[in-house]
Amino acid sequence: MRVLAVDTSTPAGSLAVLESDRVLGVVSTWVEETYSSRLFRHLEFLLRELRIELPQFDLYAVAAGPGSFTGLRVGLTAVKGWAEVHGKPIAAVSGLQAVASQAHATEPLLVPVIDARRGQIYGGMYERRGGRLERRGDEVVMTLEEFLALLPAEAAGARLAFVTPTPELIAAAVARSEFFRCPVETVSAVLAPIIGRLGLAQAERGELVDSLALDAHYIRRSDAELLWRG
């Protein structure tokens, strides 16, 4: 299965092309330039280099959030359009899951953290079950200190590891918290290849959507009140 993976949820946006589990090409830039101006330019470059055309993809995988409203809107709108025109399915993938999926840590609980800017973070918790990661509760946006204060109740004494592309953002606060013994693992901010692989896994489980059903996973500040319910 040939996959085009798109991530516009963070400043380190990326595109990747996969043939089954094999990554054929990746484009990523971390620049102060809007996604609306660079996404299609980078896509054109990647497809030209690989000599592939949009109709030749079997699946589009896209980061559906959490992330900036503007960035997510650009990526999701593009994927919606391609899927509708070419009649292809979509895998909507969590960016936090893509971060957690890169971890080499052996702890049963993984806590991915992404910079949400303005003094806040996006955070969540994933549990290893049967060779895959399953989300434990809701993904949230709040200050790091608030997030760390809420973790003990959900972790319930289980070992956990923090996973993030920006360790400098959380390392000091973790060291001052009751989780000071927990590892902080650094992973890549380039998420498109991982999003592609997670999208393939979702396709195998039949967890796909069409262009009409695709929606962004925006997290509002008030969602903090719903932390890990459900």
PLM ranges: what are they?
Residues 185-216:
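Glycine-rich phosphate-binding/hydrolytic loop that grips phosphoryl groups
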Residues 20-23, 76-86, 128-131:
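A glycine- and small-aliphatic-rich helix-loop capping segment at beta-alpha/alpha-beta transitions
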Residues 46-50, 85, 103, 195-203:
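Stable alpha-helical structural segments in soluble proteins, enriched in small hydrophobic residues
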Residues 61-92:
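DPxDG-like acidic metal-binding loop motif
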Residues 22, 34, 89-190, 218, ...:
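Surface "functional belts" at beta-alpha junctions
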Residues 36, 40-43, 79, 96, ...:
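A general structural signal for well-ordered alpha-helical segments in protein cores
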Residues 1-66, 189:
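N-terminal beta-alpha supersecondary unit
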